[in-house]
Swiss-Prot record:
PROSITE patterns: RIBOSOMAL_L31 (PS01143). Residues 74-94 have a biased composition (Basic and acidic residues). InterPro entries: Ribosomal_bL28/bL31-like_sf (IPR034704), Ribosomal_bL31 (IPR002150), Ribosomal_bL31_A (IPR027491), Ribosomal_bL31_sf (IPR042105). The keyword Ribosomal protein applies. Residues 65-94 are annotated as: Disordered. This is Large ribosomal subunit protein bL31.
Length: 94
């Protein structure tokens, strides 16, 4: 005999919510589904191009790959530490 009550609750009219608006209904195991992008505002379907900066991902990319404004500052610091190491090292004198 199969076990009873092992399946999650099914909501045939689950609401899909984007930016506070109900954009569609579907069947799901959750009563509400919150999304950032759906076909009504996705750049591919609307023909527009925009950057979706969710949680600062663009800024993180810029920092990670050295495209931020502080790139020159960090390279200057590296140069000064390397110069210091060279000047502090003992010289070989015979």
């Amino acid at each position: 005999m199969p076990k009873e009550d092992i399946h999650p609750t099914w909501y045939p009219d689950a609401k899909v919510i984007c930016n506070g608006e109900v954009v569609m209904t579907t069947g799901s195991t959750q009563p509400e589904i919150h999304v950032d992008v759906w076909s009504g505002n996705h750049p591919f379907f609307t023909g527009t191009q925009k950057i979706l900066d969710t949680e600062g991902r663009v800024d993180r990319f810029m920092r990670k790959y050295g495209m931020a404004d502080s790139e020159n500052d960090s390279t200057d610091k590296k140069k000064t530490t390397n110069e210091k190491k060279v000047s502090d090292s003992p010289s070989k004198e015979s």
